[in-house]
Amino acid sequence: MTDTFQHISVLLHESIDGLAIKPDGIYIDGTFGRGGHSRTILSKLGEHGRLYSIDRDPQAIAEAGKIDDPRFTIIHGPFSGMANYAEQYDLVGKVDGVLLDLGVSSPQLDDAERGFSFMKDGPLDMRMDPTSGIPVSQWLMEADLDDITWVIREFGEDKHARRIAKAIVAHREDETKEPLTRTSQLAKLISEAAPKSFKEKKHPATRAFQAFRIYINSELEEIDTALKGAASILAPEGRLSVISFHSLEDRMVKRFMRKESKGPEVPHGIPLTEAQIKALGSANMKTVGKAIMPTAQEIELNPRSRSSVLRIAEKL
């Protein structure tokens, strides 16, 4: 952990407890971040336990390099590749627990150069892995009005999506204006585009910045693939512990766990034999307890934990 950007792991003990860690078990931390969850898992493992952590952020990989432990392996890549990594390390069906801590880490938000925050001026980037893909600034220069509107509405759930998109396109087409290359420029533009009646407690740019970040990093597709991958590599009684930070993420996690715990749907109105019904398969997982929210004490200590939700499921 650097001296400049500190990170407090959200729902740390609850998410680790949800894994029901065995000292000699095999675990995957799909989101290493700054290592809070990984280090806690390692502290609970015995000599024969193993932890494989994943992250696509080069800064996270550098932080992981500080852990000198033969039980620990760091993998540089997106967590959507979890099933592939498990195959490479011969872990399919042997993993006792998978942890996913979704969203942006505090160091990413606090480092203005990453371009995630509307509170600090920096390059308008927002890529989790700055070495791949295109920055938000480039996408905003190329996307049309309908695409920008759709992204803000779909991933930011912002009712002023069209209004904001029009302001962005108008700015882009005005040759007297500087191109949108800084977070402060975009935040100011969105604030000015917001109706004067705007009364939300959040900054007017909150939802749009979330939307652009989710879109540019394909976050929801990554989560969907990671959840399916985790379910496919867990051992019987293996646990999946997932922390989400906004309604879109939590909705995906909730639906996935519910679907996996119910099994495939039997088509209505089509007579099937018992053998045919069995062939459809059965439930793959079961949910463990109810959704867990941060305590008032944790929120006071770490305000960014306010919107977090932890859900746990177990492989059957």
From Swiss-Prot:
Entry annotated with the keyword Signal: no
Family (UniProt): Belongs to the methyltransferase superfamily. RsmH family.
Broad class of enzyme this protein falls into: transferase
Catalysis performed (reactions): cytidine(1402) in 16S rRNA + S-adenosyl-L-methionine = N(4)-methylcytidine(1402) in 16S rRNA + S-adenosyl-L-homocysteine + H(+)
InterPro entries hit by this protein: RsmH, SAM-dep_MeTrfase_MraW_recog, SAM-dependent_MTases_sf
Sites where the protein binds S-adenosyl-L-methionine: G35, G36, H37, D55, F79, D101, Q108
Main subcellular location: cytoplasm
Keywords: Cytoplasm, Methyltransferase, rRNA processing, S-adenosyl-L-methionine, Transferase
Function: Specifically methylates the N4 position of cytidine in position 1402 (C1402) of 16S rRNA.
EC number: 2.1.1.199
GO MF assignments: rRNA (cytosine-N4-)-methyltransferase activity
Keyword Transport among record annotations: no
Gene3D superfamilies in alphabetical order: Putative methyltransferase TM0872, insert domain, Vaccinia Virus protein VP39
Cellular compartment(s): Cytoplasm
GO biological process, one term: rRNA base methylation
Protein name listed in UniProt: Ribosomal RNA small subunit methyltransferase H
Gene Ontology cellular component annotations, sorted alphabetically: cytoplasm
